[in-house]
Amino acid sequence: MARMVRRNRKIVNYSEFGDFEDGDEDFACIAAPLTKKSRTQPKEPKKENKKKQKTQKEFTSSQKQSPIGRTSLDDSFCERDLNVTLALSIKEKSANILEVQNSKEQGQVLDDDIPRNGCRQWTAASKAFSHQKLLTIDSCDREHVTDSEPVTIPDEESEEDSDYREGNDEDCAMEKMKINGMKKKIKRQTRKEKKTPKSENNTTVMELKSEQTQKMMSTSSEPVGRPLYTSSPVTNKKPKWVPPGRACAVSFL
């Protein structure tokens, strides 16, 4: 272990400096000279000044660069208009959705409120209208006969009627039977009208054939010449048959 080294201390005699009466003057408050600064002043203001200078420099540099990257007034107005239109379109979509929902609900309520007792009146009017249509179609088909397909009446009215005829099953069945009967009649008439020209053609062909057969019969019924040799009554031999061509030749000779 190293031993502690004792330092030599000097002893000061204050009596050498003079009287102690003037000792208080040394501790008196004396104003510092103007040229020197006090050590107690804080150092923070320097930092603040530096920060201010930096901000000013940045601001000036941004002002210099701003004309290049600055947006024009027209562009800014366009952006505002776009934002406004987007907001309005979103609001309109929401309003349209609400209107559609309300209209659907109102339509369901109206359908429920329709009375079924008035179905008969509506069906009677539809009957009259369909009957008139059928009559006009019959007249047109009789006047203008063509080789086209038979006329078919659309079943839209019958389908619409069936939706409103749930309460009156008997009336609906009778009406359907009548409509089907009218359709069958129209189809039969068109088929008959198509068959009539074919029958006329057949009759003309038969007449031509009959005329030809009559001519053939008339030619075959011409008189045949007499035979050259006649058999005697004594003998029982049969006479020989001679064709008509030879007989004619012999007679000419």
Swiss-Prot record:
Signal peptide: none
Bias (Acidic residues): 154-169
SUBUNIT field: Monomer.
Ranges where the record places region Interaction with DNA: 32-51, 190-241
Record-level GO cellular component terms: chromosome; nucleus
MF annotations from Gene Ontology: D-loop DNA binding; DNA binding; DNA secondary structure binding; double-stranded DNA binding; single-stranded DNA binding
UniProt region (Disordered), positions on chain: 33-74, 141-169, 184-244
Subcellular location: Chromosome; Nucleus
Ranges of compositional bias, category Basic residues: 184-195
Positions of disulphide bridges: none
Ranges annotated as biased composition (Polar residues): 199-222
Record-given protein name: RAD51-associated protein 1
Primary residence: nucleus
A GO BP entry: interstrand cross-link repair
Keywords for the protein's UniProt record, in alphabetical order: Chromosome, DNA damage, DNA recombination, DNA repair, DNA-binding, Meiosis, Nucleus
Function recorded in the entry: Structure-specific DNA-binding protein involved in DNA repair by promoting RAD51-mediated homologous recombination. Acts by stimulating D-Loop formation by RAD51: specifically enhances joint molecule formation through its structure-specific DNA interaction and its interaction with RAD51. Binds single-stranded DNA (ssDNA), double-stranded DNA (dsDNA) and secondary DNA structures, such as D-loop structures: has a strong preference for branched-DNA structures that are obligatory intermediates during joint molecule formation.
